[in-house]
């Protein structure tokens, strides 16, 4: 089967924005204008096509990136048909992982901004992720009909906060209630959309006289940006020769793809204005798979390899998302970088070292699926029947192996115990948690060896709340969630010598006799436990020495202060005695345990708490607040630097885990939601006396 759409006419784009910028409505309009969707879905009444999980419709926030394919021939029908694959991305900071993984497989992005709120917190996070993967982007300033809408303020914010060079290619005609349309600066005409046809029909009209000077000023800036694309255009521009419409678009396209400028448009998706010309801009300025560099990877013997976006190259693809579909089971979303693959073909997963048969291949339109026979370079599709693949795995031609660069996922920062409400839910909960962890690499499930509880860990409180909610809805598991917990440890601060342990029971018949003398000393951090046999002259027989070690090890599981595990201690067996008849392994095990407990009490036991390495990325104006707050959490700030490419500061600190619960919520309110943070375990450190006392008392209560 030959290719329906040439790869040059593909656009793989993401639509990214802050939580309320109207991104889902914008996507809905795209689906409507591209003729896929005949009834507009509104987020307000929970009917939007892209927000397909029940919870998303209830909360009105997009949680899962749904992938949709649409076709576009231009607002005026003047383009050959282009195929646009759209990945809708969530705007909430707890779902940053979703944005991250979609950025990895996109060729371009459309950043949606609220004309009133402007560059908001998640916009900054998304911008950083787009920078990380070198994704070219255009900007769409939405909600121009809202009170307080200001297109030019957003342009300034992109420059100041994001250090991006935003180049308006449109300016608004009016704003708030008087928003009527846009001025197309390339054509130097105003565009007015027809309300009766919900914006399908439009006309070019003359620019209102009062707007002409402003339009001319911004057009000059736009042409200058286009002319800087190459020597020939620049010479023509400097010689005072006007650039043609085609030359302007070529110049802007070249610079957008090189990530030097961000073309800026505006509109009101809700009022059916502007999305149509934004689609034209996707075609005019964002790259096709053929415009981006070949994807890099390595062979199984670690030599560098690459794949060009061509059907003639060996098949290579990246699995970027796993979803459980109520009808077909597990869906693996993948982006094809090179070659062709048919349903039924065998593909190789070099990360797992497994061959798998590709079952059905589905193309998704939100959650409506269409079965297709083959996919080619540049396509995004979902596969049924892959058992082994997980997010970030490569799928490739078994005869021409390449391993594409894996995605990097953040470590979870919050943990809670979770237990089923009934015995019947126990097994179902295990299955549900494993399935959810498979879908979401930033969600972990572990078992606490001390308490036996199941611990779930994720990117924030909302993240875990939604996963527990999904367990209930999708798997019918009712679970209760505990308060977040801290894993403390105990150790000793000083050495003690000649600590005795005697276990003697002699009351007729076979008795028990074990007697040991130990020296204890502290070990350096992370030293664990060490046992040394220093017995001379056989005062404790050889065969009983391992029993002493065993007795001490059993005691290490619960320290004398608050019953937490004991770490970093060295025990040396120096003396003891035995009885020919009554001594046995059990007696020496008990004697070892008793001596260790006694020794620990005398060796100034202390409580250790986990310290976390915390990095906060924040806009500059909130740096003081962030540092003050970390100090109030007993944190030690030990470094601060500019974020590369501008746009704020990185604050580095070491903070006790115990004080970090609820931090994502606090940080959000402290910085108007504009900061993000990462947190990972660093080491254990001595807890201050007042903290230790509170923990010990709580444990004894």
UniProtKB/Swiss-Prot annotation:
GO biological process per UniProt: ribosome disassembly
UniProt key word Nucleotide-binding: yes
Cellular compartments per GO CC: cytoplasm
Gene3D superfamilies referenced in this protein's UniProt entry, alphabetically: 3.30.230.10, 3.30.70.240, Elongation Factor G (Translational Gtpase), domain 3 (3.30.70.870), P-loop containing nucleotide triphosphate hydrolases (3.40.50.300), Translation factors (2.40.30.10)
Annotated localization: Cytoplasm
Domain tr-type G: 8-290
InterPro entries: EFG_II, EFG_III, EFG_III/V, EFG_IV, EFG_V, EFG_V-like, EFTu-like_2, G_TR_CS
Gene Ontology MF terms: GTP binding; GTPase activity; guanosine tetraphosphate binding; translation elongation factor activity
Keyword terms, alphabetized: Cytoplasm, Elongation factor, GTP-binding, Nucleotide-binding, Protein biosynthesis
Entry keyword annotation includes Chloroplast: no
Binding site for GTP: 17-24, 88-92, 142-145
Family (UniProt): Belongs to the TRAFAC class translation factor GTPase superfamily. Classic translation factor GTPase family. EF-G/EF-2 subfamily.
Entry function: Catalyzes the GTP-dependent ribosomal translocation step during translation elongation. During this step, the ribosome changes from the pre-translocational (PRE) to the post-translocational (POST) state as the newly formed A-site-bound peptidyl-tRNA and P-site-bound deacylated tRNA move to the P and E sites, respectively. Catalyzes the coordinated movement of the two tRNA molecules, the mRNA and conformational changes in the ribosome.
Protein name according to UniProt: Elongation factor G 2
Annotated organism of origin: Cupriavidus pinatubonensis (strain JMP 134 / LMG 1197)
Record gene name: fusA2
